[in-house]
Amino acid sequence: VIHLRDRNIDMFKKDLILRNPLRSFGRGGEEILAAGCFGAVLAPAGVGKTAFLVQLALNAMLQEKKVLHISLDEPVTKVSLWYAKLFQDLADRANLTRLDGVLEDLLPHRFIMTFKVEGFTVPKLEERLTDLTAQNIFHPEMVLIDGFPFGEADRERLMALKLLAGRLGVYVWFTVHTHRHEKPTAEGMPPALARAGDLFDVILQLDARGADITIQPLRGIASDAVENRLRLDPATMLIRDEG
């Protein structure tokens, strides 16, 4: 028996998936990253890195994929608010009404984990993940790490994380905090990724110019596929396609 409520929720999900602007990356319904791969979203503070990651997560959750959101900056309650706000804004933009129960239907596909920056280690993360999976509580397919402290000593930690991602069969998105005054390296990378940029398969930069925020691919996606098309709306932080 298919209940009307369940059918409506499925319709809303499919509608939001089809409206996802990131489909213009040319990968159809597939994720941007493959299992074991790293992606990075680069921007200065306040430009929209967390909002971008949450929208990646919501799109995966709409496809019933399990998302582990690791925050090194914010408590669980604040991360949860990001999801609620951006989901409502996505629905409003799509003129979808009567959304009772839709977000609640998605939440079992998300698990939020928080660490203090100084307390975040790969062995500690692996221990907590092992507890989740061994007890059959949560088996992530996508991992977000918001607030990772990129620096000179962190290549080894990133290499250990990549090995862990490969063993678990997950792909990982990071936020990377950049500074407007910093000059890129000869390879076009920000200094924060100077020693570890080669570990990343996809790198996207949020480029704020005035009131406009463009999404520029630096690696892993053909730039002509999204040339000046994808934006972050500075009012809502929603990704939009102007192609």
Listing of model-derived features with the role each one plays in the protein:
Residues 1-10:
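Short, Lys/Arg-enriched N-terminal segments with co-localized hydrophobic residues
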Residues 34-39, 65:
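Pre-Walker A (Motif I) flank of P-loop NTPase domains
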Residues 45:
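The conserved Walker
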Residues 48:
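Conserved glycine(s) of the Walker
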Residues 51-117:
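Conserved P-loop
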Residues 110-170:
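Phosphate-binding/switch loop-helix module in NTP-utilizing enzymes
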Residues 177-243:
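Phosphate-binding/switch region of NTP-binding enzymes
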